[in-house]
From Swiss-Prot:
Keyword line: ATP-binding, Calcium, Carbohydrate metabolism, Cell adhesion, Cell projection, Cleavage on pair of basic residues, Developmental protein, Disulfide bond, Glycoprotein, Immunity, Innate immunity, Kinase, Manganese, Membrane, Metal-binding, Nucleotide-binding, Phosphoprotein, Receptor, Repeat, Signal, Transferase, Transmembrane, Transmembrane helix, Tyrosine-protein kinase
Predominant subcellular localization, coarse grouping: membrane
Reported impact of P1434L: In e1391; dauer formation above 20 degrees Celsius and increased lifespan. Increases the number of muscle membrane extensions during larval development
Biased composition annotated in UniProt, kind: Basic residues: 961-970
Binding sites annotated in the UniProt record for ATP: C1252, G1253, E1254, G1255, S1256, F1257, G1258, K1259, V1260, K1282
Compositionally biased residues, Low complexity: 971-980, 1808-1821
UniProt-annotated location(s): Membrane
Effect of S573L: In e1368; dauer formation above 25 degrees Celsius. Enhances dauer formation in a tatn-1 RNAi mutant background
Protein name as catalogued: Insulin-like receptor
Swiss-Prot/TrEMBL catalytic activity: L-tyrosyl-[protein] + ATP = O-phospho-L-tyrosyl-[protein] + ADP + H(+)
Family: Belongs to the protein kinase superfamily. Tyr protein kinase family. Insulin receptor subfamily.
Outcome recorded upon mutating C146Y: Embronically lethal
Length: 1846
């Protein structure tokens, strides 16, 4: 092995060791392929090298923003993680999901055979084998969890948490610089990372203590999910969150700060950059006061938030700091997105263009990615997300995935995580921890959670692992580590006496029913935050408050409907000693309690005030319901409903004209006919500048007693000369009001009048208008960085844009001489390359623009200087008593830049900051939100003022407004429409802007206004006002100019006057760019070897232009220059076609160098890669070499023939044997198509008859062969023809023909013979042996209808002789033994697939699912096919493994079908329950009724759970052959030619089979009621039916006896025993009556797979059809035979009699019965009445719902009297009459409570009409307005006057 290979191997080995030390994930103990491992190592090594290069590059160019670095680093990190996961292993956590050995234990490692390694093999092969044995990435995404993380004070300092999960295996993260968590279970906080505490300390230590840098912060490269809150607060030096959390996908929000899940607050240097974040599952977003943080409002936060708690509070603080920091947040596209499919887009309203689509950006280079599956339409619920290609992830994913359709590749789980996979819910034996993952009970109880620095007991109850109890449970007072189930409904009492001012506090009382104390709610937030909908559920459980209810300042509340269950306020304490309910200062409250709420107050009154949207009529409704008189002080009509539209008179205002500095309004005059006209003063027009159109703006916004943001103009009312009012009113605002161009104004009109009786006010809605454009000021041009092919220019926006600046026009042109002039004199003596100097540039200049004066005829908006000059004129204030001194103008210019703060916003911000500091300094609990919340009874001064009800300040209409002057420069326009300049010299521009890759600039079309010059329109959305002119020539002088233009689609728009800013600038040169590429230098000999022509390609990019080239010919020996040629790059000269010529060269070795000279100077020297060899030709010519190659090829051909002959001699026989085997096993050579062979028949060989059957995979027809002989020599006439019903090209059709292929290999007596295949027609036909009697299952079921058969007598062998039964079982076993000998697995052995011919011989058929097992012990199918679940073994159900032993299991099920005459296996169970019954519970079918122990032992042998414990078919044939006929022995495959003899050790012994549950129970003389075991109501099963054989109908006793009455046979019956096992719980599986009447099994095509039609008279009805006498009238004799009951002691109820002769079964909702329509004469199907109750006129019925018909009242009375006498005899049984328990086996349970029936529940109270109704099932037809339905909760007998005994 070479030294280089050794070095490479050692290097790879070192990489693996390093990866193992980093401990990123577990390893798997299986091998991987050579290619995969090599690629993984190669990729890792290459990525590490690239990463080092990038790091070195960033060290030198750290000031350049690299937008692609993050993606490259992420890809590298992901590849490293894959290799690390495949090599390393971490320790086991309580959740075993971290261990990859869960499914591949270490003891089962794949062994490697090294015997083939020869001694000559190098060490490389051995190392590769060892490498492949250990490198195997896990199939699932491994989860590594961390608890809550708090980084504080220093970037690397992780503080210990007070609140922990208490995981004993939790790892301490202190001191780590890189945390490898994938999930943080809790919140992650970065706070107070400040180098200096105060500004004085910062100034003092600025030079000694620089701020922290980005590289010092801890990184989380693998973190995908934070289950709590992400908080970044007061952190310096942190520039980009992308570098800290490069893969963060999901923020859970299970614990919130206030109601926010993402908080970024007061961070001076931060950029968000969380471009992978796709889901915020709960909570809102608050991002404020971050001075340099841009793009906060470009993200669609509402799209990320999936819950109704979606309050978003973000600002763009960088815009307010523009004059201080010089930073302006850019607008526009951040990534190129053709077709708008890659990025997400926001829709913003624009007055001129309507709705505008704006690209959502995280930064200037990264947009918010779009995924069609983040939300599921049309519900908009959370979706699974997308993978990297945009495809839909698995439904259990959230936030995206690595691979589609793979629940193990999710970034986060939608529901629950368990063992590396996302699942819907935990299994029954597991417990849900933290609402996200499953743990075992032992793992749960190991946890010791710490809440508030105190350990609390953990509990594992009802599938929940938590410190609190689940719903319906409460803490056990005797043991606080346990929960106990509540008796009835849990009543949770919460002792609170604090303010509910945050959403987490509200969540803490979600389960509370009784509030012990005062409930004060003060939740601030946006109305559209969705909190109101969440609070609706939070307060829904409260029904009692012991104190008072106070709702104040809660903006999310629209109504108080969330207290829908509030019934009582005890008011033990009163608010202000007066009020039990207080509601005030709720700005959005529109309604009070729901009209259905039945609320009572024990004492106190109600106070409702200052709710501006609450109409007074709702207050009156509430007071009327509470029976409390209205009080004008407590329920003030004047302070409620001020902003609501309760009663109003609207004024419709129209705009008649709009100019740049004026707006004209008009409206109809106000109707004053019904008021005192002398009191009407006039109209006042209010207006103010607004940033945007806000449909929700109100008149009261931005107003106080001192400062009013609205300006106003008053117009006095005058009557006309005739005394009539003016029909229309006209007003305008103009230069005197300092109206500015292109400014949006809000306005409204209000009337002014003196208060008097009957006065009415008029007010208009708020409208919006934007003034017109005016010529903008010119921009100011500045120069920035210059590069070799680009010039970065910057400029300042016009001081007065006077319109929406849509774009800037940038023009540039070359100002350079042609290089061809210099090329003419390049090779002259005076211009040698050595003496050439660099070209000198003309002086670079900047042309200053002159300010443009606005014509004096127009009044413009005042500038800052003019406003300061008129300061004295502004010092005025409204004459309002108590008004504060006006300070709006006295404030400094810096303060004037900021908007006057809203008092309520200040209160909300203060509350948020207090809560934030509490959370940071006192971290909350991880397990849950604390129920004991700290007292928050603070009341601010603002709230104290608000609580002074009836003293709300009012604004006088005559007050003069103050004008707030903004001293900021106007911001650029946000318009994105394409301009069309009006300057004649400019060309038309394109309509749709594009985006420059890697920049923030949105561009329009580049055009060339003049020859040699270019221009481009740059969108004004680029708020940094800069542009990089790219694709410039290197080292070239350019002239640049700039102008600003407005939106040309708007009338009056224009560009700035032609005084454009200008500059001259030369681009930089590029070192070595003038070099000729070495590989392009070529040479060739000319006429002889002494003449060489050298050619090359010129440089593609040069520094300004090429003047010429210098070509040198050097000696290869000493490097001396032999010849030099100089050539100028003149016009028409070609270096490739012409080049230079060297002549008269001597023999030797030379190389060529070429030097290009550009405008900048001589470039580097380029040398040819191939040397020039000049020599005289020798012996080895081309002809000689070709002849030698020909001889070599001949010798190689001879050697190949020898090798071929040797292989044929040595290995020919083995290849032949393998070929023969593959012919016998065609499935090894399946090529997905059927090939016709000798079995092929012609279509006219058979005649197709009528259809005789249909199965899951096709139809069967009768056929007749036309004297045809099959390939096996069978001449056949009648035959069966199978035809597939699917598409001929489908996969099922191929499987159908493959079945025929399989049958070609079989030739035995007990397998259906194949006669041939007709594949030339569509659909194809398979011709088989005719089996006249059909399949075994249907044949057995047909025997049930035989009159000889009586199930109650167990006369099974009277129907099928015992020897015939043995014969059939032996024939099936012999056929399966034949398949077993051929290594074939049938996979679908069932009675339906066993066919019977006319001499009652059973043969095995239907090989559609058969598979070959020659090389494997079992067969595991792939794809999706129908499977016979009820005939499958446990290993087949769970693992999909099939072999001969699984067929043995199916044979046991076939025996069950035989002894039950074709009964459905596992009757009463669904397919999922069958899987649980067999695979999980490991149970088998209980012994059928009338089944002999011998056969049940054989069944149990076949149903052994372990496959190796089951017998083989060979053993079963020898066992059954002892009782079989001699004919069978003559035809048996096992007992004839093959002589497959068993050893003594292989013989079966039935005595070893357990006899449990096989012996018949002892029959008692009479049923004993006391022996019937009593069950609790919760343990009863309503599906417990009675076997049919226990009933026998007898003829009527006399003419008056009800035909519905049934009695017990004279034979004493066995008392039903209490079922105690899972087998006996499924009682329907124990009877031999066959399948239920309507068993629903939906799976595939026939009765065993899908729902089928059923026959009548099959199984008994449901047990609860009977009713006792005392169940209805308290022990009286009435209701003798209602609901199918009997009036005879000892007689049962109509359990076995069908409802109306098969019309309906009387069963509800269970799979055992089918609901069918019944005739109008029938009562409801659940009555269970006998068939004789119907079919007679509907007259003189004694009772409803199936009562027996009586011909007269006397007959009914006589029968009732007899029943009453029988009832008296039952008094010792608790007063019960004809009880259901008189019949053992009915499932009725006696009640321990005296006088009550255990089968029924009292639902009706006692009233004047009856004594109550314990029946739960309804009443007569006349209930429910005469409809035919019966009432579920009504009385059984309603009409008392018709009672015969009343």
């Amino acid at each position: 092995m070479t030294r280089m290979n050794i070095v490479r191997c050692r290097r790879r080995h070192k990489i693996l060791e390093n990866l193992e030390e980093e401990n990123l994930g577990p390893s798997c103990s299986s091998t991987t392929s050579t290619t995969a491992a090599t690629e993984a190592l190669g990729t890792t090594t290459e990525d590490m090298r690239l990463k080092q290069q990038r790091s070195s590059s960033r060290a030198t160019e750290h000031d350049i923003v690299d937008g692609n670095h993050h993606d490259d680093e992420h890809i590298t990190m992901r590849r490293l993680r894959l290799v690390k996961n495949s090599r390393t292993r971490r320790r086991t956590t309580p959740d075993s999901s971290m261990d990859c050995y869960e499914e591949n234990p270490p003891s089962q490692k794949t062994s490697i055979n090294y015997s083939w390694i020869s001694k000559k093999s190098s060490m490389t092969s051995l190392m590769l084998l060892l490498l492949f044995a250990f490198v195997q990435p896990c199939a699932s995404i491994v989860e590594k969890r961390c608890g809550p993380i708090d980084i504080r004070n220093r970037p690397w300092d992780i503080k210990p948490q007070w609140s922990k999960l208490g995981d004993p295996n939790e790892k301490d993260l202190a001191g780590q610089r890189m945390v490898n968590c994938t999930v943080v279970e809790g919140s992650l906080t970065i706070s107070f990372v400040l180098k200096h505490k105060t500004k004085a300390q910062e100034e003092m230590h600025r030079s000694l203590q620089p701020r922290y840098s980005q590289d010092e912060f801890i990184t989380f490269p693998h973190l995908r999910e934070i289950t709590g809150t992400l908080l970044v607060f007061e952190t310096e030096g942190l520039v980009d969150l992308r570098k800290i959390f490069p893969n963060l996908r999901v923020i859970g929000g299970r614990s919130l700060i206030q109601h926010y899940a993402l908080i970024i607050y007061r961070n001076p240097d931060l950029e968000i950059g969380l471009d992978k974040l796709s889901v915020i599952r709960n909570g809102g977003v608050r991002i404020i006061d971050n001075r340099k943080l841009c793009y906060t409002k470009t993200i669609d936060w509402k799209h990320l938030i999936t819950s109704s708690i979606n309050d978003v509070v973000v600002d763009n603080a960088a815009e307010y700091a523009v004059t201080e920091t010089g930073l302006m947040c850019p607008r526009g596209a951040c990534e190129e997105d053709k077709g708008e499919s890659k990025c997400h887009y926001l829709e913003e309203k624009n007055q001129e263009q309507g709705v505008e689509r704006v690209q959502s950006c995280w930064s200037n280079t990264t947009c918010q990615k779009s995924c069609a599956y983040d939300r599921l339409l049309p519900t908009k619920e959370i979706g699974p997300g997308c993978d990297a290609n945009g495809d839909r992830c698995h439904d259990q994913c959230v936030g995206g995935c690595e691979r589609v359709n793979d629940a193990t590749a999710c970034h986060a789980c939608k529901n629950v995580y368990h063992k590396g996979k996302c699942i819907e819910k935990c299994d029954a034996h597991l417990y849900l921890l933290l609402q996200r993952r499953c743990v075992t009970r032992e793992q749960c109880l190991q946890l010791n959670p710490v809440l508030s620095n105190k350990t609390v007991p953990i509990k594992a109850t009802a599938g929940l692992c938590s410190d609190k109890c689940p719903d319906g449970y409460q803490i056990n007072p005797d043991d606080h580590r346990e929960c106990r189930k509540c008796v009835g409904k849990c009543e949770i009492v919460c002792e609170i006496n604090h303010v509910i001012d945050t959403f987490p506090k509200a969540q803490a009382i979600r389960l509370c029913n009784i509030i012990d104390g005062n409930l004060t709610i003060e939740i601030r937030g946006k109305q559209d935050s969705g909190m109101a909908s969440e609070l609706k559920d939070i307060f829904a459980n409260i029904h009692t408050i012991t104190g008072y209810l106070l709702v104040r300042q809660s903006s999310p509340f629209i109504s108080l409907n969330m207290f829908r269950n509030l019934r009582r306020i005890e008011a033990k304490s009163l608010f202000r000693n007066l009020y039990a309910i207080t509601v005030f200062e709720n700005p959005n409250l529109k309604k009070l309690f729901d009209s259905t709420t039945d609320l009572t107050l024990d004492r106190g009154t109600v106070s409702i005030a200052n709710n501006k949207m609450l109409c007074f009529k709702y207050i009156k409704q509430l007071m009327s319901k509470l029976n409390i008189p209205l009080d004008p002080i407590d329920q003030s009509e004047g302070t409620n409903g001020e902003k609501a539209i309760c009663e109003d008179m609207a004024i419709n205002v129209s705009i008649t004209a709009v100019n740049a500095d004026s707006v004209f309004f008009s409206w109809p005059s106000f109707n004053i006919t019904d008021i005192d006209q002398r009191k009407f003063l006039g109209y006042e027009l209010f207006f103010k500048e607004v940033p945007r159109i806000d449909e929700n703006m109100t008149i009261e916004e931005d107003r106080s007693a001192c400062v009013d943001s609205w300006q106003s103009v008053f117009k006095q009312y005058y009557e006309t000369s005739n005394g009539e009012p003016t029909p229309d009113i006209f007003m305008d605002i103009g230069p005197r009001e300092r109206i500015r161009p292109n400014t949006l104004y809000a306005y409204y009109v209000a009337t002014q009048m003196v208060l008097h009786a009957g006065a009415k006010n008029g007010v208009s809605k708020i409208g919006f208008v934007r003034t017109s454009y005016y010529t903008p000021d010119p921009p100011t041009l500045a120069l920035a960085q210059v590069d070799s092919d680009a010039i970065h220019i910057t400029w300042e926006a016009p001081l007065q844009p006077n319109g929406d600046l849509t774009h800037y026009t940038i023009m540039w042109r070359e100002n350079e001489v042609s290089p061809y002039e210099e090329a003419e004199k390049f090779c002259t003596d005076a211009s040698t390359p050595a003496n050439r100097q660099h070209t000198k540039d003309p002086k670079e200049t900047i042309v200053a623009d002159k300010p443009v004066d606005i014509p004096s005829s127009r009044t413009v908006a005042p500038t800052l200087l003019t406003m300061m000059g008129h300061e004295d004129q502004q010092k005025t204030c409204a004459a309002t008593p108590g008004c504060c001194s006006c300070s709006a103008i006295e404030e400094s210019s810096e303060q004037n830049k900021k908007k006057r703060p809203d008092p309520m916003s200040a209160i909300e911000s203060s509350a948020f900051e207090n809560k934030l500091l509490d959370e940071v300094l006192m971290p909350r609990d991880t397990m849950r939100v604390r129920r004991s919340i700290e007292d928050a009874n603070r009341v601010s001064e603002e709230l104290e003022k608000a609580e002074n009800l009836g003293k709300a300040p009012k604004t006088l209409g005559g007050k003069k407004p103050l004008i707030h002057i903004s001293k900021k420069k106007p911001s650029s326009s946000s318009t994105t429409s394409t301009p069309a300049p009006t300057i004649a010299s400019m060309y038309a521009l394109t309509r749709k802007p594009t985006t420059v890759p890697g920049t923030r600039i949105r561009l329009y079309e580049i055009y060339e206004p003049l020859p040699g010059s270019w221009a481009i329109n740059v969108s004004a959305l680029a708020l940094d006002n800069s542009y990089v002119i790219r694709n410039l020539k290197h080292y070239t002088l350019y002239a640049i100019s700039l102008s600003a233009c407005q939106n040309m689609t708007v009338p009056g728009a224009s560009c700035s006057i032609s005084h454009r800013a200008g500059a001259l600038k030369r681009t930089k040169h590029i070192t070595d760019i003038d070099k000729v590429l070495n590989e392009t230098i070529e040479w060739r000999f000319m006429n002889n070897s002494q003449q060489v022509n050298v050619t090359w390609d010129p440089p593609t990019e040069v520094n300004g232009g090429i003047f010429g080239y210098v070509v040198k010919l050097k000696s290869k020996v000493d490097g001396s220059i032999v010849m030099t040629r100089c050539v100028g790059a003149k016009r028409g000269y070609s270096t490739r076609n012409q080049g230079v010529l060297f002549q008269n060269l001597a023999d030797g070795r030379y190389f060529v160098s070429v030097t290009a000279t550009s405008v900048h100077g001589a470039g580097p020297e380029a040398e040819s890669s191939d040397p020039i060899v000049v020599m005289t030709p020798g012996f080895f010519t081309v002809e000689i070499i070709l002849g030698m190659l020909l001889v070599f090829l001949i010798l190689m051909s001879i050697a190949g023939c020898i090798i071929y002959y040797y292989i044929q001699v040595r290995y020919g026989k083995k290849v032949k044997a393998l070929s023969d085997f593959m012919q016998l096993n065609p499935e090894y050579c399946v090529d997905n198509k059927y090939n016709a062979d000798d079995w092929e028949l012609r279509q006219d060989d058979v005649v197709l008859g009528q259809q005789c059957g249909e199965g899951s995979f096709g139809k069967v027809y009768l056929g007749t062969g036309n004297n045809v002989v099959s390939l096996m020599g069978d001449r056949f006439g009648p035959c069966a023809i199978k035809i597939n019903v699917d598409d001929p090209a489908s996969t099922e059709n191929l499987n159908y023909l493959m079945e025929a292929n399989i049958m070609k290999n079989f030739k035995t007596n007990f397998i259906v013979k194949l006669y041939g295949v007709i594949s030339t027609v569509q659909p194809a036909m398979v011709v088989m042996e005719m089996m006249d009697l059909g399949n075994l299952r249907d044949y057995l079921r047909s025997k049930r209808e035989d009159e000889v058969f009586n199930e109650t007598d167990c006369n099974f062998f009277d129907i099928i002789p015992r020897d015939k039964f043995h014969e059939w079982a032996a024939q099936i076993c012999d056929g399966m033994a034949y398949l077993e000998s051929l290594k074939f697995c049938h996979r679908d052995l069932a009675a339906r697939n066993c066919m019977i011919n006319r001499d009652e011989t059973v043969k095995i058929g239907d090989f559609g699912m058969a598979r070959d097992l020659f090389y494997h012990d079992y067969y595991k199918p792939s794809g999706k096919r129908m499977m016979p679940v009820r005939w499958m073994s446990p290993e087949s159900l769970k693992d999909g493994k099939f072999d001969s032993k699984s067929d043995v299991w199916s044979f046991g099920v076939v025996l069950y079908e035989m002894v039950t005459l074709g009964a459905q296996p596992y009757i009463g169970l669904s397919n999922d329950e069958v899987l649980n019954y067999i695979g999980m519970a490991r149970k088998v079918i209980k012994k059928p009724e009338c089944c002999e122990n011998y056969w049940y032992k054989v069944m149990k042998m076949c149903w052994r759970y372990s496959p190796r414990d089951r017998p083989t078919f060979l053993q079963l044939v020898h066992l059954l052959a002892a009782e079989a006929s001699p004919e069978f022995r003559d035809l048996s495959f096992v007992l004839t030619d093959n002589q497959m003899i068993l050893d003594d050790s292989e013989a079966l012994d039935l005595d070893d089979i357990d006899d449990t549950d096989m012996n018949d129970q002892v029959v008692e003389v009479a049923p004993d009621v006391e022996n019937v075991e009593v069950q609790s109501d919760s343990e009863r099963r309503n599906t417990d039916s009675i076997p049919l054989k226990q009933f026998k109908t007898i003829p009527p006793i006399n003419a008056t006896t009800s035909h519905s009455t049934i009695s017990i046979d004279e034979t004493p019956m066995k008392a039903k025993q209490r079922e105690g096992s899972l087998d006996e719980e499924y009682a329907l599986m124990n009877h031999s009556g066959g399948p239920s009447d309507a068993e629903v099994r939906t799976y595939a095509g026939d009765g065993d797979y899908v729902e089928r039609d059923v026959r009548e008279n099959d199984v008994p009805t449901r047990r609860n059809t009977g009713a006792s006498t005392s169940s209805y009238t308290g022990g009286g004799p009435y209701c003798l035979t209602n609901r199918g009951g009997s009036n005879e002691r000892g007689a049962g109820f109509g359990e076995a009699v069908r409802l109306t002769d098969g019309v309906g079964s009387g069963h509800l909702n269970d799979d055992d019965y089918v609901e069918k329509e019944i005739s109008s004469m029938d009562t409801r199907r659940s009555t269970g009445a006998s068939s004789s109750s119907y079919g007679v006129p509907q007259t003189n019925w004694s009772g409803n719902r199936g009562a027996t018909y009586y011909t007269s009242k006397a007959q009914q009375a006589a029968t009732a009297a007899a029943a009453a006498a029988a009832a008296l005899q039952q008094q010792q049984n608790g007063g019960r009459g004809d009880r259901l328990t008189q019949l053992p086996g009915t499932g009725h349970l006696q009640s321990t409570r005296g006088g009550q029936d255990g089968d029924y529940i009292e639902t009706e109270p006692k009233n004047y009409r009856n004594n109550g109704s314990p029946s739960r099932n309804g009443n007569s037809r006349d209930i429910f307005n005469g409809r035919s339905a019966f009432g579920e909760n009504e009385h059984l007998i309603e009409d008392n006057e018709h009672h015969p005994l009343v």
